[in-house]
Amino acid sequence: MAQNGSEAGPLVAGVAGRYASALFELARDERQVDAVAESLNQFDGLLKESADLRRLVRSPVFSAEEQEAAIGAVLDKAGIGGLAGNFIRLAASNRRLFALPDMIDAFRALVQDSKGIVRAQVRVAERPSDAVIEEIKASLRDIAKADVDVDLVVDPSLIGGLVVKMGSRMVDASLKTKLNGIRLAMRAAR
């Protein structure tokens, strides 16, 4: 049983799940889980910053050789080596770069599960103060009875309030949803 109370651990499926599970097991055996996670986070940051790198990763137009050469250059320049660098190079040589963002997410889920950390996504209309963020984290920790890693997403379409997803649970306390509920009730009252 996983530390967070789930029996099966995080859901890691498909190509991304298989690659992430293999990397996690190897990193755990080599006692390099944190180093690999840090390197993958660094690469994920590069992906988020560079439209060209995202295009290289997602596009089937590039040959395997072109992808391998370009990824190798990016990894060398960023100083990403070891297990994480080899893993990314393997994904390139196997034409699986398109799944790399999902592989990184699946690896993170495995790491967090192994440490008893629960992931939560909190969508808000505008970025709250640090004090409010800490209150949200404390509330989620109390509910989960575990450490919680909060992914804060700003979504102006919510108008106000927040939407929290934690595991299989979701709480929608957004103003947008409340207004939609009022709108539906008024239509039904006609």
Curated annotation (Swiss-Prot):
Q: Does the keyword DNA-binding apply?
A: no
Location of this chain's protein in the cell: Cell inner membrane
Q: Does the keyword Cell inner membrane apply?
A: yes
Q: Which PROSITE patterns match?
A: ATPASE_DELTA
Record membrane topology: Peripheral membrane protein
For this UniProt record, the keywords arranged alphabetically read as follows: ATP synthesis, Cell inner membrane, Cell membrane, CF(1), Hydrogen ion transport, Ion transport, Membrane, Transport
State the Gene Ontology terms under molecular function.
Answer: proton-transporting ATP synthase activity, rotational mechanism
CC annotations in GO:
plasma membrane; proton-transporting ATP synthase complex
Q: How does it assemble?
A: F-type ATPases have 2 components, F(1) - the catalytic core - and F(0) - the membrane proton channel. F(1) has five subunits: alpha(3), beta(3), gamma(1), delta(1), epsilon(1). F(0) has three main subunits: a(1), b(2) and c(10-14). The alpha and beta chains form an alternating ring which encloses part of the gamma chain. F(1) is attached to F(0) by a central stalk formed by the gamma and epsilon chains, while a peripheral stalk is formed by the delta and b chains.
The record's function comment reads:
F(1)F(0) ATP synthase produces ATP from ADP in the presence of a proton or sodium gradient. F-type ATPases consist of two structural domains, F(1) containing the extramembraneous catalytic core and F(0) containing the membrane proton channel, linked together by a central stalk and a peripheral stalk. During catalysis, ATP synthesis in the catalytic domain of F(1) is coupled via a rotary mechanism of the central stalk subunits to proton translocation.
Query: Which family, according to UniProt?
Result: Belongs to the ATPase delta chain family.
What name is this protein filed under? ATP synthase subunit delta
Q: Which organism is it from?
A: Methylobacterium radiotolerans (strain ATCC 27329 / DSM 1819 / JCM 2831 / NBRC 15690 / NCIMB 10815 / 0-1)
